[in-house]
């Protein structure tokens, strides 16, 4: 039984590494909305290679295009795909009405950055904001 239905949480990680959690969410009909920011690459590694290694990209484009809406259907949950803010707003409003878990895939540019970031070996004084 889910006790605190109003709690919100944000987790940032590679979504492919957490697919197994969908099985639990579906099994227990947890009203969890997962927003997937899909840039079709290994974004954090690519960002580091852009910022610190003069765009010498290696192993950041897996050459696979996962269809997260079809994957959601395969897990037995509702999936949405958005390419702009109005689509996201519509999908999110509908997802809030669902009784079980939902995924909202947001297609973003492969060069979209996650900021702020701190370089390896750095501390808060080395923070990169743009």
Question: Regions from the language model: what does each represent?
Answer:
Residues 27-44:
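A glycine-rich helix N-cap at a beta->alpha junction
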Residues 26, 50-54, 98-99, 121-123:
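Short, hinge-like loop/turn segments at secondary-structure boundaries
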Residues 50-91:
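Conserved thiamine diphosphate
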Residues 14-21:
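Short glycine/serine/threonine-rich phosphate/pyrophosphate-binding segments
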Residues 85, 90-130:
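Glycine/aspartate-rich loop-and-adjacent alpha/beta segment that forms the canonical ThDP
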